[in-house]
Structure formats: structure tokens, C-alpha cells
Amino acid sequence: MNQFLAALALVLLVCVGLCAQSTNGDRERLERVRAYYETAQRFERGGNWSEAEKVWRTVLDLASDDARAWTNLGVALSRQSKTIEAIEAWNRAIAIDPKLAGPYFNLGLNLVKSSQYKAAISPLQRTLSIEPRNEGARRALALALIGSERFQEATREIAQLLAQSPRDAGLLELAAQSFMRQNRYAEAVLVLRRRLDLPGATSHLWAQYGDALDGASRTPEAAEAYRKAVELDPASPLVRYGLGYLYWKLYRYDDAERELIEVLRLDPKDPRAAFTLGDLYLTKGETQRSLPLLETAATAYPNEFDTRFALGRALMLSGDSKRGVDELRAAVKNNDAIADGHFQLGRALLRVGSETEGKQELKRAEALNEKRRAGEAERFRKKLP
């Protein structure tokens, strides 16, 4: 009996010793992992991502089931443009701990940066289901939704962010972008006005504000916004063209001519400026001045109704009837649903002696006008009480 008790005591002592060794080994391993964490994070703060990668791999040699280490390894790989390996690391982290937000967030953010907007939505939504207050994830989700043309959902996400940060310039610009893509111009005007009241208003922002005002049928104010945009960036043909176009739209032809001439001085081959200025001259009866400009526009945009139509009219007025008919035919071919195209082509054909075809085109013009009038009458009838 005494021998049995002695043997049992020996076994227990051995077990206790082994447990103590195991506990001490685990404690030592944890201390080593903690030290490596600090080293890796120090490399990250210094932007030394290749060294950070090496340390995170060492951590994973010690603790292969450390989801946070896999997440951080993915970040280090991503910063070195090792995208495929980074995604693999984040997926490993997700497999180990599906309730950890970090790998979902980094995966979604990486997809947004590479313009894979639809694919980014799911991991970012998963991030927010785990961390509802993760502002970075919500911003990235808003971008992904805009990139996927899911504008109403994007607007809801941006609204939540703006509720917390109403003077955040980036969020206001993002909201404006979403509203503009939805043609919600009045709301775009409001958020852009708020953005312009903050520091750092750029020419681009003033131009975008002008576009929103014009979309909201506030064209005189839009022209003023574009004038400020031009003041901030006078060498931009794009911004100056926007101002010239708005002046043209407001029948301020002298102002429009001045701006459009300046656009063409900056960029002699700008087809939009050439078309608008050419159309302006055509409207003023200056056919010869309009022709070279409209030629430039028609060459640049051969499949547009407006460019071929305007050139056709100018050629007819200048006496080049054959080319005029050809251009008007091309315009109608580009869009045969515009009554004035058929009308002008019909008149041109009659002028060159093609009476039968000319009358057919005039009949098509009348039929389209009748269809338009009937549609307007029906819309009016539906509005009646």
C-alpha cells in the first residue's frame, strides 16, 4: 500500500511539473509574440512595410491562428502592392475569427481603391454589422455604392456620416457627387453651398456648384458661379467653356463669344467650343465665320445630330447645297426623331430639285410635330382635376 501511494505521488509530481513547464512555455511564447507585435508596429509607424511583413510572418510562425496578425500581415502586403497575398491573408483572418472587423474592412477598402466597387460592398457592410461606428468603413461603403450606381443607398450612408460631422468637407463633396448623379440638383446646390462656405473652395467646386444651379434652372446664378471658377483657374479651357456655354444659353452672345474665343486660344481644337461659337455665329447670321468652326465640331463628333445639323444649315446658307443636303441627311440618320431635322432636310431637297423626297421629309416633320402636340395634350389632360 505504501509503495502504491509513493508511486501515485511520483506520478502527480511529474504531472504538476509538466503542467508548470507547459504554462511557462505558453507564457514565454506569449511574451515573444507581444514583443514581435511591438516591433512590427514600430516598423509600420516608420513606413518600413517590408520589415513589418517579416515580423508578422514570424509572429504567425509562433501563433498561426492569430487572426489579428493575419490582418496586419495583409496590411503590410497591401502597402507593398502585393494585393493577391494581402487578400489571402485577410481571408485567413476571416476564417479564423469571422467576428473580427479588421479583415473585412481592409478587404473592402482594397477593393474600393482598385475600383471593384460592387465586390467591396459586402465586406464593408459586414464590417459595419460588427462595428456600426466605424466611420472609415462607412465612407468606403458610400464610395462603393456610388461607384456601383446605387446612389440612394449611398446618400443614406453619407447622411449618417454628416449627422456626426456636418462640416466635413470631404463628406459634403461626396454628398454633392451622389446628388448630382441622381439629378437631385436642388439638394446638390445646398450641400455645395455648405462646402463653399468652408476653407479650400476650388475652381472645380465652383464649377460643380454652377452645374447644380443650372440643373436646378437657376442659370443666371450658375453663370456667376462659373465666373468665380474662371477667376480661380483662368487657364482651364474646361471651366472657361462652361462659362461661355452658360452665357450662350442666356443669350448673352457678346460675353459668350469672348469666353469661347479665349477657350479656342487656349485649345484651338476644342470641339465643344468650336460648335458653340459656330452655332452662335450662325444664329447671328455670320455664316462664313461659323463654317470652319462647325466643320471642326462635325469632324470631332460625326455621330451627333447637332453638329451635322448645324453644319448642314450653314452650308445651305453659304450656297453649298450639295454638301448641305449630305450633312442634313447625316443629321437625320443620327436621330430621325427630331422634327426640325426632317423639315430642314425637306426644304434643302426641294431647293436642289428633289421634289418627291423633299415632300416626304416635310410630311415626316409634320407627323412628328403632330405626335408631339398629341403627347403634350395628353399630359395636360392628365393634370386636369
PLM feature segments, named:
Residues 21-35, 196-197, 372, 382-384:
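TPR-adjacent "capping" and linker segments in tetratricopeptide-repeat scaffold/adaptor proteins
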